């Protein structure tokens, strides 16, 4: 054992390059002496515990030797010598156990005593701090009071219990108070000013000999201590004048309040005495408002005050109509009828109580007949709505709707206006095909008095504001969710119904021309442009689809006359702005059909045959027909039902024939355009998200098809599209694509335009099929059968020798750099053309569709054979993603990321013999660190990505009689361990390895639980790891 200890000492002396031992570093980093002492005691107890365990193991080995001797076995001389020391080992074991108990008890007592001392010291320090703060506050209070004149007089004359101070010393204190309690200096910040004051207070508390205000801080401190002990500042006298003034102000305010209360009580009592005998038989009087009524006996002109109070307080009851009259029963009946009508409409007005009430009654009744009662929208009764329709024919059509309006025929309601929230939509009959939709106007009022309640101004304001947010109001309106309805009660200053203008169309459709715009085409165009500039911006468009296939109205044209909602100019202009935001200038000239949330706007290309629709000319009205979409029942916010459940679509201008679209009657198409894409130039300027080195080819060739974005309709007009495909347009109708010498030939016109069967003029047959005007071809074929991305594409060649290539806008993808060998790239095709490698292959994306996706749903990927290889197979991209009765779904193609290269190997070139347990193993030599994932200073591997990793470690034990324990740790968890000990002071290796599934951010490191590690320039102790598979 002595030799072993000497060897350990020699080894430790050889490690002079270490500045501090781990124990010394822990002691130096301790926050307090008690923590350092506690750490030192704990480490000593741990070492003693391990020593006891080793002695117990030696005792067990010696007992085994003794048993073997008893059994007659022969032992070697070393074993016999060890058996002779059995008693000594027992003695050492008992001594070590007793020593452990003693040290444990002593350490506990010492720690308790030290904690008590620390607590006492902390309390004393806290008390001194509190005392300093208390003294500073007392000094500040004294100095603040010394600034008052009456306090200075008391100290100069020694009055009111104040001690006598010479004027010189008093001047010192006054000057010092101005320094420590200064007025706010705007040139300095509050922090700087308070810092200066704190310096004065600090020097005062210290009592230094520094000069201040003509004396020293020590002298000022003595003067202040005398003032504090004098007792004058225990109760500083306050000036009597200020007290009396404050009391007088309080008394005057209290007297005013009492007088106001008494006057209000007297007035309320006099009013109750006057009003109570007249309206005592009426039980409906609301007595809550009696205290708010102000009545004057000297008031003679009651009519003027009644008009003012009527406009100000319309919520009181009409009590003058129900007072008993001796004239006859007719007035009673009229008053009762007026009372009932006021209860129905819940209109209340102020009661008029005066001595000359009988004289005012005829005037009030006449004004009541002339004035128009107001019915709030929130007070409607669902069972008896009071809206009206304009004509008997329209009334009959309205009654044919599922939930007809109830029309009342009471005479007393004729001169009344409809409430501002009531909307009436006229329904057009089948005979009036070319007549425009009209909104019926209510009957004219007999007269409008100047005393009309103020709430009609709100109605006018609502009518003014109803022109701008029509697209929002249309979703919550009371009728059939229209954006262009006008209230029936509005008094129009011009003619409401504009005469319709016929437009030369094959199938004329009813177009709503009721508009608030001027009739002059120039003024109308300017108004439209102004409104379009107001609503221009970024929008989110989504067309709601009717997902219920069982509704007959959504699949079968209704036999009833179609009820379309009148659309205002704002909705049409919003559709125009929607179209400008929605169409992203496709490179192929096509006729897009744009679907927005309010209406379906159909436009045609300039190449289309037939007449075209222009929105700003005087020959066509400024409205575009917008079909009303029925909302789900759960989405309706009002009890009023929609007026129609059938749909009617406007025909596309320039249509050559009308086709009854029976196959499209059950088609449901959902468009969800989240946001318009930025221009192509911005996307090309953006840095590609993948590393550069491989390229990706996408070519898109699309025949012109009608985008199937309409909801179930009655008629759809199909336009004949010219086969234009950008730069690859040929006058003979042939469309050639630079995709392995591929040519398209136009098919004859049919019900659904589709391209003809394509033909391949070179090697390789075409895979896939064409649906919806898109040809999907596989480009994922290598000679070995592996499906990967094409890093290059050969020059397209046609059998006739002609060359044609589509010039399409594209996004460029630069690939990952791979080292090429023998003209071969990993996971890619061999080069089979003489053209070599194209550096910048572009990705062409089709812009013929207007559906949306996180990138762009219209960017359908088309792949084609490069002309290399005879055997082609269908890839997942080649599967057609469209069907004749469904929308085109997006296919997103992203390049596969390259697996990261992660590997490291570290070693130790010096011994590691810490004095404490569970220390991290830090390495001083880095053999390899691929990926920069191993931290040499901490000895930790940081997991960069999720995946499966392999770790191997070998640790050579220092030649001491101490076993070696090494743990492989993941964060703070022990994964695997290694052990080395043969019972002799010699070098042994502790090694192990593990295959682990790690997550990004995990840390792998080695921990030396116990023992010492041997290190040399031959690097016996190493730690390595690498990434096996990436998730």
UniProtKB/Swiss-Prot annotation:
Q: Give start-end positions of Low complexity composition bias.
A: 608-646
Q: Which Gene3D superfamilies match?
A: 2.60.120.40
* Keyword Phosphoprotein in annotation: yes
Where does the record place Polar residues bias? 425-439, 446-458, 830-853
Q: How does it sit in the membrane?
A: Peripheral membrane protein
Binding residues for Ca(2+) 2: 988
A GO CC annotation recorded here is: nucleoplasm
Q: Name the tissues where it is expressed.
A: Specifically expressed in brain (at protein level).
- Keyword Phosphoprotein on this protein? yes
Q: What SMART domains does the record point to?
A: C1Q
Q: What are the residue boundaries of the C1q domain, all occurrences included? A: 897-1031
Question: Where is the stretch described as Disordered?
Answer: 1-27, 364-458, 500-520, 605-658, 830-876
UniProt note: domains? The C1q domain is essential for the function in Wnt signaling.
Instruction: State whether it acts alone or in a complex, and with which partners, per the record.
Output: Homotrimer; via C1q domain. Found in a complex with LRP6, CCNY and CDK14 during G2/M stage; CAPRIN2 functions as a scaffold for the complex by binding to CCNY via its N terminus and to CDK14 via its C terminus. Interacts with LRP5. Interacts with LRP6.
What name does this protein carry? Caprin-2
- Give the organism, scientific name: Mus musculus
Tell me what gene encodes this: Caprin2
């Amino acid at each position: 054992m002595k030799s072993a200890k000497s060897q350990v000492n020699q080894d430790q002396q050889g490690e002079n390059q270490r500045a501090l031992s781990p124990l010394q570093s822990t002691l130096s980093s301790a926050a307090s002496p008690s923590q350092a002492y506690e750490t030192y005691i704990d480490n000593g107890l741990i070492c003693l515990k391990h020593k006891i365990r080793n002695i117990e193991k030696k005792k067990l080995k010696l007992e085994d030797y003794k048993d073997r001797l008893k059994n007659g076995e022969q032992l070697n001389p070393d074993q016999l010598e060890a058996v002779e020391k059995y008693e000594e080992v027992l003695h050492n074991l008992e001594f070590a156990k007793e020593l452990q108990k003693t040290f444990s008890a002593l350490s506990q007592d010492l720690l308790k005593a030290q904690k008590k001392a620390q607590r006492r010291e902390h309390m004393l320090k806290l008390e001194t701090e509190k005392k300093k703060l208390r003294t500073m506050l007392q000094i500040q209070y004294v100095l603040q009071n010394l600034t008052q004149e009456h306090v200075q007089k008391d100290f100069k004359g020694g009055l009111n219990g104040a001690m006598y101070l010479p004027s010189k010393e008093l001047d010192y204190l006054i000057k010092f108070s101005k320094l420590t309690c200064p007025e706010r200096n705007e040139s300095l910040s509050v922090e700087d000013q308070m810092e200066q004051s704190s310096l004065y207070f600090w020097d005062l508390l210290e009592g230094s000999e520094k000069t201040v205000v003509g004396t020293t801080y020590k002298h000022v401190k003595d003067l202040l201590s005398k003032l504090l002990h004098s007792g004058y500042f225990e109760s500083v006298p306050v000036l009597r004048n200020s007290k009396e003034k404050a009391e007088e102000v309080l008394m005057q305010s209290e007297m005013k309040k009492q007088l106001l209360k008494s006057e209000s009580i007297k007035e309320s009592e006099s009013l109750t005495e006057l009003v109570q005998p007249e309206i005592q038989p009426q039980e409906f009087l609301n007595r809550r408002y009696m205290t708010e009524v102000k009545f004057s006996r000297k008031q003679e002109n009651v009519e003027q005050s009644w008009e003012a109070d009527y406009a100000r307080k319309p919520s009181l009851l009409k009590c003058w109509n129900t007072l008993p009259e001796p004239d006859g029963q007719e007035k009673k009946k009229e008053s009762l009828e007026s009372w009932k009508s006021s209860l129905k409409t819940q209109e209340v007005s102020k009661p008029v109580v005066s001595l000359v009430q009988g004289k005012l009654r005829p005037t009030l009744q006449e004004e009541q007949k002339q004035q128009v009662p107001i019915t709030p929208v929130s007070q409607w009764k669902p069972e008896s709505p009071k809206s009206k329709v304009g004509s008997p024919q329209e009334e009959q059509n309205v009654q044919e709707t599922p939930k007809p309006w109830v029309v009342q025929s009471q005479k007393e309601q004729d001169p009344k206006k409809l409430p501002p929230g009531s909307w009436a939509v006229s329904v057009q009959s089948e005979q009036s095909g070319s007549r425009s939709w009209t909104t019926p106007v209510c009957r004219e009022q007999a007269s409008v008095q100047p005393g009309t309640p103020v709430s009609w101004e709100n109605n006018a304001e609502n009518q003014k504001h109803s022109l701008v947010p029509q697209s929002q109001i249309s979703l919550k309106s009371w009728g059939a969710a229209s954006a262009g309805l006008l209230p029936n009660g509005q008094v129009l200053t011009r003619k409401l119904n504009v005469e319709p203008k016929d437009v030369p169309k094959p199938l004329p459709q009813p177009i709503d021309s009721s508009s608030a715009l001027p009739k002059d085409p120039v003024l109308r165009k300017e108004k439209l442009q102004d409104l379009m500039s107001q609503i221009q911006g970024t929008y989110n468009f989504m067309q709601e689809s009717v997902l219920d296939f069982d509704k007959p109205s959504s699949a079968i044209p209704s036999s009833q006359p179609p009820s379309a909602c009148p659309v205002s100019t704002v909705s049409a202009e919003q559709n125009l702005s929607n179209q400008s935001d929605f169409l992203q200038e496709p490179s192929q000239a096509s006729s897009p059909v744009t679907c927005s949330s309010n209406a379906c706007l159909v436009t045609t290309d300039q190449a289309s045959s037939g007449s075209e629709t222009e929105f700003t000319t005087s020959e066509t009205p400024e409205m575009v027909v917008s079909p009303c979409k029925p909302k789900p029942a759960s989405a309706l916010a009002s009890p009023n039902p929609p007026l129609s459940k059938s749909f009617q679509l406007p025909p596309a201008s320039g249509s050559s024939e009308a086709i009854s679209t029976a196959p499209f009657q059950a088609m449901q198409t959902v468009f969800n355009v989240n946001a318009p894409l930025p221009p192509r130039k911005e996307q090309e300027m953006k840095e590609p998200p993948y590393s550069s080195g491989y390229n990706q080819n996408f070519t898109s060739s699309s025949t012109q098809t009608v985008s199937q974005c309409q909801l179930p309709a009655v008629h759809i007009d199909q336009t004949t599209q010219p086969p234009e495909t950008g730069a690859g347009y040929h006058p003979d109708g042939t469309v050639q694509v630079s995709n392995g010498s591929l040519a398209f030939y136009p098919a004859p016109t049919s019900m659904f335009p589709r391209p003809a069967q394509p033909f391949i003029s070179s090697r390789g047959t075409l895979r896939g099929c064409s649906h919806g005007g898109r040809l999907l071809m596989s480009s994922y074929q290598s000679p070995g059968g592996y499906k990967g991305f094409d890093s290059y594409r050969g020059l397209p060649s046609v059998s006739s020798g002609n060359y044609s290539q589509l010039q399409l806008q594209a996004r460029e993808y630069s690939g990952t750099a791979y080292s090429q060998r023998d003209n071969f790239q990993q996971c890619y095709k061999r080069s089979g053309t003489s053209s070599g490698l194209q550096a910048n292959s572009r990705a062409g994306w089709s812009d013929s569709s207007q559906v949306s996706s996180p990138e762009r749903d219209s960017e359908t990927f088309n792949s084609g054979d490069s002309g290399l290889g005879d055997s082609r197979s269908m890839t997942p991209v080649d599967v057609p993603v469209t069907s004749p009765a469904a929308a085109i779904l997006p296919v997103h193609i992203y390049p596969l990321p390259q697996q990261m290269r992660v590997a490291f190997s570290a070693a130790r070139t010096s011994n590691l013999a810490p004095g404490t347990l569970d220390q991290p193993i830090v390495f001083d030599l880095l053999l390899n660190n691929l990926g920069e994932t191993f931290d040499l200073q901490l000895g930790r591997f940081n997991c960069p990505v999720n995946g499966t990793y392999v770790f191997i470690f070998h640790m050579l034990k220092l030649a001491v009689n101490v076993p070696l324990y090494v743990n492989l740790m993941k964060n703070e968890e022990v994964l695997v361990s290694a052990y080395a000990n043969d019972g002799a002071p010699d070098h042994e290796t502790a090694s192990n390895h593990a295959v682990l599934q790690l997550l990004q951010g995990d840390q792998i490191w080695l921990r030396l639980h116990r023992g010492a590690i041997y290190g040399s320039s031959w690097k016996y102790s190493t730690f390595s790891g690498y990434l096996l598979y990436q998730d």
